[in-house]
Curated annotation (Swiss-Prot):
Residues carrying lipid (N-palmitoyl cysteine): 16
Positions where lipid (S-diacylglycerol cysteine) attaches: 16
Pfam family, one: YjbF
Cellular localisation: Cell membrane
Similarity remark: To E.coli YjbF.
Species for this entry: Escherichia coli (strain K12)
Keyword Zinc carried by entry: no
Signal peptide: 1-15
Primary subcellular site in the record, as a coarse category: membrane
GO CC annotation: plasma membrane
The protein's name: Uncharacterized lipoprotein GfcB
Keywords: Cell membrane, Lipoprotein, Membrane, Palmitate, Signal
Membrane topology, as annotated: Lipid-anchor
Amino acid sequence: MRPLILSIFALFLAGCTHSQQSMVDTFRASLFDNQDITVADQQIQALPYSTMYLRLNEGQRIFVVLGYIEQEQSKWLSQDNAMLVTHNGRLLKTVKLNNNLLEVTNSGQDPLRNALAIKDGSRWTRDILWSEDNHFRSATLSSTFSFAGLETLNIAGRNVLCNVWQEEVTSTRPEKQWQNTFWVDSATGQVRQSRQMLGAGVIPVEMTFLKPAP
């Protein structure tokens, strides 16, 4: 994931303000000792970009900036063209990572598309294709959502009251079960934090949307 971290430098090295240069220094320090990256709340608020913290496969937490939005999908880019594609917190595709999510079908029926309307027992079925250790794998996934209560998250210095939804996921071939969790802003319906799997029960992905995509 080092290329993703390095990609942030390119956004700030040209024409840095004092605050932005301080942020680059933070990235450099974290990069070389493998610490989780933490950006000061005021620096996050000052940036004109949508941003998130990302942790892949229990590795180092990094700071990612939104590249662009296309067909309602948020595309988070690195300097070497690695990319993550999300829609309201749901990971839909990755490109040029060590292991990649290649396809998710039936994404239009994902209950997270209208997160404030999710109810206990909401269901979703889709097929996924991913690469893992240089092998292509596929599975059919079936999900059931359950409400886990309210929780207030402190995100970039602001308290956000969230509906917490647990997504119980079952896959066939391979036969696996696991749980994804989504924290949905109770006012806007935007997913502000998530824990989910890239593949069928493998490769955990954690995202905290500091300034969510519009």
